[in-house]
Amino acid sequence: MKSTTTVEPFETVEPNTTNREDVSQLGDAPVAITRYGIPVRVSSATENGWEVFDPCGDLQTVSKIVPIENTQVVLDPGHGGKDSGAIGHAGLKESVVNLKVAIATSQLLQDKGFPTFLTRMSDYYISLDERIALADAANAKAFISIHHNAPASAASNTPGTEVFAQSKDSESARLSGLLHKEVFEALKGVKGVQWTSRWDAGALRVLNSQGSDAYRLVRKPETTNALIEVGYLSSPSEGAFMAKDEYVQIVAQALATA
């Protein structure tokens, strides 16, 4: 673990063979939650417990884990810890809003019978590569990275929701379209918010100069994925709305419905 990373501590372990299983018994998705509530990839069972990859992608040893199996949806709350993302109304951090939306969405999906897995469950930094590795290790059907945009764009009568898909993946395009439709329609019905939007907002595919997907979180995962910028946290009106529990529930319901 790099010293600059803010994260709940990994434990110092002593030899202990209780609560251990062979890593092969974790099934096709060797991911787990540590006793500190940190989602991790599992490398192997050892005499001292388990070797797992921490949020920086470094190997650490822990004495106890809770295996997570049969995941259908991985939710990735963007940013976290030293990487706060956009800063909005009254200092509201994007990383905090992303996490609230992800947790609420996870609960709704679980209630519908869809097992979920979050790449982070509190406010700490996790590398892009480890987010991607967690999503692929979970062997889920979908990976959704949740974000909020900045800087503010032009004033609009409708939300500026953007969802990015893998350029060569039809399932990613379908997922992005469904996410955009549900979130856009849910937010469009909210009264009293001055929206902002780019002219081309929607379900998008964005390429870099090499002709591949511009965003690493879209380009790299093998899991069907989409990255959503729900709205503009940097807009004073939208930012004030995003600070409310009402906003979190509206967006979570839309994401879970998609």
Task: Enumerate the language-model features and the residues they cover.
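Catalytic-site microenvironment of enzymes
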Residues: 1-258
